[in-house]
Amino acid sequence: MTTSSSSPLSYKDAGVDIDAGDALVERIKPLAKKTMREGVLAGIGGFGALFEVPKRYKEPVLVSGTDGVGTKLRLAFEWNMHDTVGIDLVAMSVNDVLVQGAEPLFFLDYFACGKLDVDTAAAVVGGIAKGCELSGCALIGGETAEMPGMYPEGEYDLAGFAVGAVEKSKILTGKEVQPGDVVLGLASSGVHSNGFSLVRKCIERAGADRPATLDGKPFKQALMEPTRLYVKNVLAALAAHPIKALAHITGGGLLENIPRVLPEGTAAHLKKGSWPQTELFAWLQKTAGIDDFEMNRTFNNGIGMVVVVDAANAQATAKTLRDAGEQVYEIGVIAPRGEGAAVIVG
């Protein structure tokens, strides 16, 4: 036979602090306000956010993307570095939307935890707002889920959702890519948000022998450097040049992501050494003891976005991107595929 206490139980007693949630919303509102842009009719606070597609689009096609930050979050927990993973969250989705030729319009986030720490959550959302601001998209809504017993104390998970628009006639499909086209690579800012399960093993293996700095940055900062946001610079290049295809280099690296935008019967031949390997990736490769093939299939290995253009437009496109602030390398050409792999590095 069981007995129950006569004391009343509140939602807070059960582990859900509504007041903390309300306090977080008040912290978020001014951050979200800074991201507002044309098209926002109603943002944070309502049951649903409202967005009107800008009238300058004649035949708008909506493009959606969703992603997370993966096990990079484990380092954020261990090192108490929460202010940049929100940028990662935005970048993973808006860069994906971008490769269709689309302009990101708005973003929503999902933050889940076992016990809500308002300061930690506000730091994360501050990063999300910064990522949206840098991408020109509005943070118009989100969900904060406090779920006692679902996550260890001090841990959380993130998911992001982006929607963009592109003129129907300007959707990038890669179907016009052909042999002779040039492959440009835009430098990454670091590991970005993929491969961190292996990164964490490398940190564990290195122990106290890990370097103090990598590429001029403190070790932890180098690894937590947020995913580069390519949106504004690449949109400017798209407006000025006939770009044929874009590929966001995420999980699977160069070897798995470039083929996603290549027509059947074509392959990308990348020239080894045509872009520099940073200290960060050299350290990861040496510590893990893996070959070049595995590096290019696990990490972005220094190239975060690939741009495919006609050879006649390659120099002008590269100049536009460089002038905007990108590090651009001519890393290869498109060739007939034959019997080989879709991406060959050699």
From Swiss-Prot:
<keyword id="KW-0658">Purine biosynthesis</keyword>
<keyword id="KW-0547">Nucleotide-binding</keyword>
<dbReference type="InterPro" id="IPR036676">
    <property type="entry name" value="PurM-like_C_sf"/>
</dbReference>
<dbReference type="GO" id="GO:0046084">
    <property type="term" value="P:adenine biosynthetic process"/>
</dbReference>
<keyword id="KW-0067">ATP-binding</keyword>
<dbReference type="InterPro" id="IPR036921">
    <property type="entry name" value="PurM-like_N_sf"/>
</dbReference>
<dbReference type="GO" id="GO:0006189">
    <property type="term" value="P:'de novo' IMP biosynthetic process"/>
</dbReference>
<dbReference type="InterPro" id="IPR004733">
    <property type="entry name" value="PurM_cligase"/>
</dbReference>
<dbReference type="GO" id="GO:0004641">
    <property type="term" value="F:phosphoribosylformylglycinamidine cyclo-ligase activity"/>
</dbReference>
<dbReference type="GO" id="GO:0005524">
    <property type="term" value="F:ATP binding"/>
</dbReference>
<dbReference type="Pfam" id="PF02769">
    <property type="entry name" value="AIRS_C"/>
</dbReference>
<keyword id="KW-0436">Ligase</keyword>
<comment type="similarity">
    <text>Belongs to the AIR synthase family.</text>
</comment>
<protein>
    <recommendedName>
        <fullName>Phosphoribosylformylglycinamidine cyclo-ligase</fullName>
        <ecNumber>6.3.3.1</ecNumber>
    </recommendedName>
</protein>
<comment type="pathway">
    <text>Purine metabolism; IMP biosynthesis via de novo pathway; 5-amino-1-(5-phospho-D-ribosyl)imidazole from N(2)-formyl-N(1)-(5-phospho-D-ribosyl)glycinamide: step 2/2.</text>
</comment>
<keyword id="KW-0963">Cytoplasm</keyword>
<dbReference type="Pfam" id="PF00586">
    <property type="entry name" value="AIRS"/>
</dbReference>
<dbReference type="InterPro" id="IPR010918">
    <property type="entry name" value="PurM-like_C_dom"/>
</dbReference>
<dbReference type="GO" id="GO:0004637">
    <property type="term" value="F:phosphoribosylamine-glycine ligase activity"/>
</dbReference>
<dbReference type="GO" id="GO:0005829">
    <property type="term" value="C:cytosol"/>
</dbReference>
<dbReference type="InterPro" id="IPR016188">
    <property type="entry name" value="PurM-like_N"/>
</dbReference>
